[in-house]
Amino acid sequence: MVELRDNKIKHNLNNGEIVAIPMGPLNGDIIEHFGPLGFDGIWLEGEHGPVDFNNIPDLTRACDLWGMSPIVRVHQNEPGVIYRTFDLGAQGVAIPHVNTKSEAEAVVSASKFAPLGMRGSFTSRQGIGVDNYFSKANDATLTILLFEDIVAVNNLDEILEVDHIDVFYVAPG
């Protein structure tokens, strides 16, 4: 049976280890240059950069070749954008401008399969031949919330109550 690839970033964070993730590679060739350097993952920029549904599959495959976990910052907190990004090969998503508890809950709902969320039942290339894929994918997906607005700070206590968020990232906004 095929195993789900390890999310190196999530694994290391769960073990209290430091992770190294460069931001900005724009094509698979550049990602391959990062591969031998030992990074845990690559941050693919889809909000302020050219990463989109057309190139996520190739960029994430380049990460796979070197055992790096691809994280994609998407351009909006919209369920279809989030789950499609995972379906195309991302192991994590970073969601900009999450300001309320309900917005954080929407991220989880779009990122996780039932019973934790409402992500559509599609296995993508990562799930082919993987026993219990949906359960394993729920454990492996990395969800990152970006706090870029003062309203998020004002709502921080409520947002932190939301389960299944892995990283709370304070970003300049």
Give the ranges of each region predicted by the language model.
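Expand to "…catalyze enediolate/carbanion chemistry for C-C bond making/breaking, isomerization
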Residues: 1-173
